Amino acid sequence: MSYNTWHDYGYGICTDDLKEEISLVKLMKLVQTAPKLYEKVKKFIDEDCDGQIMETYDLFDTYVEEYGEVNYGGLAEILYEVIKEVENIELLVSTDFNGKEYLIYPPIYPWTLEKMSDKEKNLTEKDLVEIFSKYLHIVTNEELTVEYQSIENGG
């Protein structure tokens, strides 16, 4: 049996660096900024949770693992889906060896530009910091440093 490692690189945040627990009310405010995601989450709540959701854990784990686009990542996954829908920017959710979750904007190859929105083609570092801040401030008052990340994992 072999063991492989991989690295993800990009500019972004480690959502596990947040110290305060995210409240369900704030998390739902974040989800509501993306109408299609909100409908998916609402369907999950109605069908899988009998119309009630009691903890952020239900969304971070159960929803993300069963219905999320990347199926892991907790808050990073929710932010990924919101930003993808609202801002039309494709980010990457990644997890390191220690289970820490990241949301990053990876380096882009020139031949992928034809698939990008005009907004993404003209994205600046400042724009990216503002986007992360905009959506993080819906769920927390904490500041996360947006910086270059090197994420290593394996399996």
Q: What is the predicted function of each stretch?
A:
Residues 141-155:
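C-terminal or internal capping secondary-structure element at the end of a domain, subdomain, or sheet
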Residues 1-139, 155:
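Acidic (Asp/Glu-rich) sequence patches and key acidic residues
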